[in-house]
Amino acid sequence: YGWAACLVDVEVDLDSYEIQILRCVQAVDVGKAINPAIVRGQIEGGTLQALGWAVLENVVYKEGKVANANMTNCIVPTFADAPELETILVEVPYPYGPSGAKGVGEIPMDGPAAAVANAVEDALGCAFDALPISPEVVAAARSRWELS
């Protein structure tokens, strides 16, 4: 099993409701990192993809098919969107993996979106339970929160 922890610092513009992810720290139990640079790169790439799911990517389905399957209408993060990333490799050799290693291909996707949702909730005082947390979603949540 994989274990990880993720922390995110965000800034929310109260005029445009845009979320800027300032920093993301991801600590991952990797077993034994046979090639730490590649392991770190895998984790950072997956983390950036997961952050995109949190605030940018909105896959729309229509009649069972993806309706926005083009790069022009399904926004994904680029290098310019990358916040400061810190990756902590927690090395505890895994007795059942090759040379003590664990797979790290999927675990970077698990924590960042929840960490972003929690950070935005901490900043604004209203909870989010669906992704992406777009400016429109933030504006609607703020309106509901202000009315309550």
Residue ranges and their predicted role:
Residues 1-148:
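C-terminal catalytic domains of large/alpha subunits in multi-subunit enzymes
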